[in-house]
Amino acid sequence: MSELTTIARPYAKAAFEFAVEHKAVDQWLGMLGFAAQVAENETIHNLVHGSVAAEELANLFVGVCGEQLDEHGQNLIRVMAENGRLGVLPAVLAEFVAFKAELDKEVQADVISAIELTDQQKANIQASLEKRLARKVKLNCSMDASLMAGVLIKAGDLVIDGSVRGKLDRMADALQS
């Protein structure tokens, strides 16, 4: 676990629990998404990592976000500014999204193939993963010719390497040991 994730997780968890309790998960997702974009803005990024006073920085940040943040979202920004943590807002968003996916029983699966997959192949992979993981699966498909043939699937902690490159690497390891 990276240091950024360690710092971001408590803020994301608190925001998520508040959002669930108040049935406002999608609203909070929007607020955090906007705040994370603001935090990534080069000018704001320089101020966040500069020597601006926490209260002044929080007021500036809330001012930039305007009506995109409700009162509770503004409070989160103020707490994060007081603790010098506004720079981790993108990581807070990522953790919040992970908590939401867990609540929705969803998982993002990266499917890397040597060639473009047909819609039928994508549907078959998605159905198989949904059955195996007992979750709704969203596929993120990409191509990598270095795999030679086959697919590499990553879904959470699960990695399925059905590529020729992976098989060759495993054979090479077996021969060397």
Swiss-Prot record:
**Gene Ontology molecular-function annotations:** proton-transporting ATP synthase activity, rotational mechanism
Please give the SUPFAM superfamilies that the UniProt record associates with this protein.
Answer: N-terminal domain of the delta subunit of the F1F0-ATP synthase (SSF47928)
**Cellular localization per UniProt:** Cell inner membrane
**Which keywords describe this protein according to UniProt?**
ATP synthesis, Cell inner membrane, Cell membrane, CF(1), Hydrogen ion transport, Ion transport, Membrane, Transport
UniProt xrefs under InterPro entries:
ATP_synth_OSCP/delta_N_sf (IPR026015), ATPase_OSCP/d_CS (IPR020781), ATPase_OSCP/dsu (IPR000711)
What Gene Ontology terms describe where this protein resides (cellular component)? plasma membrane; proton-transporting ATP synthase complex
Q: Does the keyword Cytoplasm apply?
A: no
Membrane-topology descriptor: Peripheral membrane protein
| UniProt record similarity statement | Belongs to the ATPase delta chain family.
Q: What does this protein do?
A: F(1)F(0) ATP synthase produces ATP from ADP in the presence of a proton or sodium gradient. F-type ATPases consist of two structural domains, F(1) containing the extramembraneous catalytic core and F(0) containing the membrane proton channel, linked together by a central stalk and a peripheral stalk. During catalysis, ATP synthesis in the catalytic domain of F(1) is coupled via a rotary mechanism of the central stalk subunits to proton translocation. This protein is part of the stalk that links CF(0) to CF(1). It either transmits conformational changes from CF(0) to CF(1) or is implicated in proton conduction.
How it assembles, according to the record, is: F-type ATPases have 2 components, F(1) - the catalytic core - and F(0) - the membrane proton channel. F(1) has five subunits: alpha(3), beta(3), gamma(1), delta(1), epsilon(1). F(0) has three main subunits: a(1), b(2) and c(10-14). The alpha and beta chains form an alternating ring which encloses part of the gamma chain. F(1) is attached to F(0) by a central stalk formed by the gamma and epsilon chains, while a peripheral stalk is formed by the delta and b chains.
The molecule here is called ATP synthase subunit delta
Task: Tell me the organism.
Answer: Aeromonas salmonicida (strain A449)
Q: Which gene encodes it?
A: atpH
